[in-house]
Curated annotation (Swiss-Prot):
One GO CC annotation: cytoplasm
Organism: Caulobacter vibrioides (strain NA1000 / CB15N) (Caulobacter crescentus)
Name recorded for this polypeptide: Peptide methionine sulfoxide reductase MsrB
Catalytic residues (positions): C133 (nucleophile)
UniProt-annotated binding residues for Zn(2+): C61, C64, C110, C113
Gene designation: msrB
Top EC category: oxidoreductase
One Gene Ontology term from the biological process aspect of the record: response to oxidative stress
Alphabetically ordered keywords of this record: Metal-binding, Oxidoreductase, Zinc
Cofactor: Zn(2+)
Domain of life per record: Bacteria
Amino acid sequence: MTDAATLSTAGFDLTPPTEAERERLEANLTAEEARVLLHHGTEAPFCGGLLGEKSPGVYGCRLCGLPLFKHETKFESGTGWPSFYAPFAEDHVVGVRDTSYGMVRIETRCARCDSHQGHVFPDGPAPTRLRYCINSVSLQFVKAGAPLPDPLHRGDKIT
């Protein structure tokens, strides 16, 4: 953790990457990952690699590794994108008003690195009635029991 770390309610370091760290992380992205994560793109529906993933585990930010969603909150929405009814921790995902394409929506971003993840809609299942509609390419799946990726060397662990 950094000296002046901002910890999430789940104990993860939310300190944004430095400019040098961000450049290093961005250099490892594919063109499609960069288009979605950095330029607020959307992958085509029904083609994402994590859409059918049903294994126990955690879905983390593809850019910085912060855990964003738990497998227990994933559900089949029929929209063509992985959908979740709650984030890993409320303060791991940030909502930003998005008025692009003549619509009013809430864009979801990683609270640590500010990368685009998808959108949240008020049409999900109980208990939250929310649907976090997330691009597969924005996420990396970590099977239960496997160590979390730690590209920023923050020492974050699920306890």
